[in-house]
Amino acid sequence: MNILYIGSSAAFSLIPFKKLLASAYSISAVGVYKPLIFEHKVIALENESLALSAQQHAIPVIDLSLPVAELIEQISLLDIDLILMSCYSRRLPDDLINLAKAGCFNMHPSLLPRYRGPEPVFWQMKQAAEMGVSWHLVTHDLDAGDIVKQQKIKLDDGLSFEEINRSLANTGAELMLAVLADLSAQRLLKTTQDQALASYYPYPEKDDFTVDTSGSAQRAYNFMRATQVFGHVYHCDSAQHHFLLDEAIDYDNNASQASVDVQGNRLYIPFNEGVLIATYTGKLSS
């Protein structure tokens, strides 16, 4: 089975790629948008790169930024059976999708059809949603193709964005091997996505970095920890005050207090359920 693997240098793409490398399946080529490649050199990968990792394993790398006609010509020569894709942020041309005789499949970090879009982890953590990973057929409409594998995961408190993505990627990598096994045995089941349950979320904007004291301190803590990588302050209203929060330190869902307590650079903020402990920027307004 000739496989074209398309992705980026994020963990959500690299982890399944490494799983595929260690499997019995063969990767015919890797597709990356504007890859960084060094000819005839051995590179120490301090920061991992999908393109360089492929190159070090003698796997051809295809530049997906090429004109579509040139891209189709290159990939047609590989006689691709299957395209596997993870963490690739651009829409694939329909002509490229159609080159894969056994189908083109994408790994998405949510329980589709919920949380379609480019940053599903952000929105799931903001809304304290049930987390999971899905493999689905790639169609012209983003994240809307038939689901072939899906699994829920449970996350510990306080995980970073990278830790969450690694957890999702590890689960997704195992599901990928199950997809390949089912394809080989001609037993792959496809489930049409229920459009009535579908939701789509765009890239988050600065106004989306808010924490709501009507919820639980645990929810706010996990959201802030997971999204700190975006580098935004968090807006929080409590009583008559507006706070600009910097970092979530801890929470106590069993604690109860009437008002915000300031201790040094830390705020103890009462929520409907529990107390959030967070640092703040020093700017408070009444």
Question: How should these model regions be labeled?
Answer:
Residues 1-230, 235, 263-278, 282-285:
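One-carbon transfer enzymes
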Residues 171, 176, 241, 252-253:
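A ubiquitous, low-specificity "background" feature that marks scattered single residues
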Residues 236-250:
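Short, structured protein-protein interaction patches enriched in aromatics and acidic/basic residues
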Residues 247-262:
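A conserved acidic, glycine/proline-rich C-terminal tail/linker
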